[in-house]
Amino acid sequence: MNIGLFTETYYPEINGVANSVYMLKTELEEIGHNVYVFTTTTPGAPEFEHNVFRVPSLPCILITERRVGLFYQPKLASLIKKLNLDLIHTHTEFSLGIFGRIMAKELKIPTVHTYHTIYEDYTHYLTHRKLLDKRAKAFVRVFTKICCNTAEQVIVPTEKVRELLLKYSVFREISVIPTGVNLKKFNPDLHLKEDVLKLREEFGIKPDDKVLLYLGRISKEKNIGEIIEAMPEYMRERNQVKFVIVGGGPEMEHLKQLTADMNMMDKIIFTGPKPWDNIGLYYQLGDVFVSASQSETQGLTYIEAMAAGLPVVAKKDKCLDDILEPGWNGYDFTDRDELFKGLDAIFFNNNGISYGENAKLRMRKYSSEEFAKNVEMVYEEVMQRDFISEQRAAYETKKINHLFHT
């Protein structure tokens, strides 16, 4: 098959969507498909990339680290028409997603759409008043429904997201396919003990320290502040515990100030963002992965952490249902007391449970190979259907015009 992937974010950017699309391209090519990626310009992108086409872009208002491609590119459209695409798979609701659907209409080929991001959790970046935020969330729900209903098939990473789209009145068939990870990349056996100890020493972590680790985007919706605010109480009688935060984002300075105000800078360590190619080593800084986020569609960092042999202690969320088995590969929590009990059970393990080994075992079904095979099955099913591009285009045009003129 000749497959076009349209995305607003791609390697070398570090985020769940970029990783997912990069991995999908890699694995589909391994199977034998021809895969073309259409994405945005981004700082640090390689000069030469096989079958990757980049369009001029601007920073995204909703998620400032992301970029949005400039709308319809005639030269790129001409090139796409020569590629003999069989199917277009969009990974964005914004300009490149719309561009992908326009091209699918012109080429009379089907569109599959993956819904990666729960945008209702990001509207606070645009609005600072409750009424405005309520309206923004309503707009997001309608816009999401339109984007999903104009595809022949929708893919989501978890049942949590499928249920959300059904509430939005998405009527297209929805397939739940967890995004996989390159399990080999996070294998702890790849890293020498000496290298891990050296990295821990670089950040002032002693060999016998017990380390909570958060790795990912540092932003309001990730709710890292809840963990930070609990640390003075938790560490009061547990002097050997440290909390390491790896990553960057708009909340970084605020959380650093919060940490300084609590006089915890020696216990809570911010490493800043780190290169994706070396991220497996940074997971080895931790003894347990911790998160209070409830904005995840799937939580790829949970999967990466478990693949790296780290048990997870995370705030209870439906996206964890298939990943976390409390008491076996980690714990969930709803309040501070449950957070502390979960951490203590892992740090001071007196029950003989091999949390880290169990975490690795659980992740076998989340391999990138399995992910690509499941997506390929969706492609094959969609290709066998009869569909009428004109009907889809009419629906899209009508709904988008209505959305922007009411």
What are these regions (language model features)?
Residues 1-56, 376, 391, 396-406:
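N-terminal subdomain of nucleotide-sugar transferases
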